[in-house]
Design a protein with these regions (language model features):
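Short boundary/loop segments of OB/S1/cold-shock single-stranded nucleic-acid-binding domains
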Residues: 1-3
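OB-fold single-stranded nucleic acid-binding module
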Residues: 5-6, 11-120
Length: 120
């Protein structure tokens, strides 16, 4: 874990349509989006992804949205992300740091995301 990876897959909406862009807008300014990885990356999913994240890989872009969480405001005060998140259904390559989120149900994620590219 904690290595830079590039994963291909399809952006999916696990918000059940609550957000038009298909990603959750976190209070700390981060995105919480979901990638259905291509078969060759299925090994990146763990039990937390399967049980808590609908079998998808989470991706988080830091400081992407307005920050409302007080302790996160200093971190994003001098930085604002301008990554374009492709629409749900887009086949993409996401590059970033591969980690396990141990604060929740121990799912794997790409956090932070460095780059998202639409690919064929």
């Amino acid at each position: 874990m904690n290595e830079c990876v590039t994963v291909t897959g399809t952006i999916v909406d696990d918000t059940n349509g609550r957000n038009s862009d298909g990603v959750r807008h976190e209070a700390d300014g981060d995105t919480h989006g979901w990638l259905r990885p291509d078969p060759q990356f299925a090994n990146l999913l763990d039990n937390g992804n399967r049980t808590a994240e609908n079998g998808d890989l989470v991706f988080e872009i830091v400081c992407h949205y307005r920050v409302t969480q007080a302790d996160a405001k200093p971190s994003c005060s001098a930085f604002g992300d301008h990554t374009v998140i492709p629409p749900v259904g887009s086949h993409v390559a996401i590059t970033g740091t591969f980690v396990q989120d141990t604060n929740h149900q121990r799912w794997n994620e790409i956090h932070p995301v460095s780059k998202i590219l639409v690919v064929p």
